[in-house]
Amino acid sequence: MTKEQKLQLAEIRTMIPEMRRVECIHFVGIGGAGMSGIAEVLLNEGYHISGSDMAENTVTVRLAQKGAEIFFGHQASNVAKASVVVVSTAIDPSNPEIVAAKENRIPVIRRAEMLAELMRYRHGIAVAGTHGKTTTTALTTQIYSEAGLDPTFVNGGLVKNAGTNARLGSSRFLIAEADESDASFLHLQPMVSIVTNIEADHMDTYGGDFETLKQTFIDFLHNLPFYGQAVMCVDDPVVRELLPQVSRQVITYGFSDDADVRLINYRQVGQQSFFTVQRKDRTDLDIVLNIPGKHNALNATAAIAVATEEDVEDEAILTALLNFEGAGRRFDQLGEFETGNGSAMLVDDYGHHPTEVDVTIKAARAGWAEKRLVMIFQPHRYSRTRDLYDDFANVLDNVDVLIMLDVYSAGETPIAGADGRALCRTIRGRGKIDPVFVPTIEALPPVLANIIQEGDLILTQGAGDVGKLAKQLASMELNIETMKKLG
């Protein structure tokens, strides 16, 4: 970091003089993607950071190397030095660290409240929506970085070009993923808000009422100052429906004829996307985006719309998108590997909603039409499987071979008829494909060994621990005997 950048950073920190009274910030569940990002930014700002989690992972290792104090397991003594305790909604209120903090009158705040403090005196760009948040945040970060704007960013997944999910920049810009799953994005007060799309998800947060979810997005947009900007995907029917209710400047984007920033002439060749972006009063941009799928072209167009308003030079936009390496676990190509039955391509994807699974399948088909598509799908949460059961069945039978794992519960209690086995039976009953149910990841390798063929595209899909399986498969010699031994 240059001397000038250090001075800019010092200036940013002095904008929040009251925060200087905070000596130690403790994170309960520090190993999670959203929590670790904020922790890393604060650590780099010079705060003492401590945190706890149940097990070590790559994130906790990195934070420890940077100077954070990491505890494994949750106990009251972990918060002894804390000036404030940061929690996510995934943490049970009976957690001993939360109980101890409250008993000792240590403030306990939600993750989004701390993110809001980071954003308070910066030019915040918040990326919201049911799908595409992580990739759009990464794309916007890539463009701003290429333009030399050195943004701070906090993302829900790895920004591959940066090698991390969060970084402290020296400029006034902060680009952050805004989480609607617990409505905590209402704490944020950005200057620019992107809304990629709105669908029914996390409905328990909203009392099962879709109208409440829609109103929450409107409230989020009205956290913008009157001079702020809402960048909204007009292709999404719910977003379009809400446009008249948004009392801030709106910039629309999408394939639609009436979009302010319009995407045309899309085509995909292998992993790359080619398209043109038309902008009012600006020259058209012929884009080469280094990730596949129409959905990612839309995500890139959102980032272009924001960058255009900031007068980022076109060359920086073009270069950033051409060199974009993607976001972690978003159509993550882990390479070709050799098996006893031949060579196969391995792709890992985080998508766990029917819409996300659908666009991933379409991207795979568009780029690798000649390959047999073998999906290993792990449903995420019983409630989501129940609420979107028919949608999952409609989407999942569009692959050639489906291997179904049981539900990754994420702490939920099982719901009868909303599990992997039931979903498998429903899909089989339609007669299009004959899915294979495998109850656990540990039982999968020998099953997979008997299924893989030369030229297959193997897609591990889901938000649970199926991603760990993908890394395991990518890191070993996948001969048949090895896989059978794994079983």
From Swiss-Prot:
Keywords for the protein's UniProt record, in alphabetical order: ATP-binding, Cell cycle, Cell division, Cell shape, Cell wall biogenesis/degradation, Cytoplasm, Ligase, Nucleotide-binding, Peptidoglycan synthesis
Cross-referenced PANTHER family: UDP-N-ACETYLMURAMATE--L-ALANINE LIGASE, UDP-N-ACETYLMURAMATE--L-ALANINE LIGASE-RELATED
Matches recorded under Pfam families: Mur_ligase, Mur_ligase_C, Mur_ligase_M
Keyword Nucleotide-binding: yes
Name of this chain's protein: UDP-N-acetylmuramate--L-alanine ligase
Assigned protein family: Belongs to the MurCDEF family.
Catalyzed chemical reaction(s): UDP-N-acetyl-alpha-D-muramate + L-alanine + ATP = UDP-N-acetyl-alpha-D-muramoyl-L-alanine + ADP + phosphate + H(+)
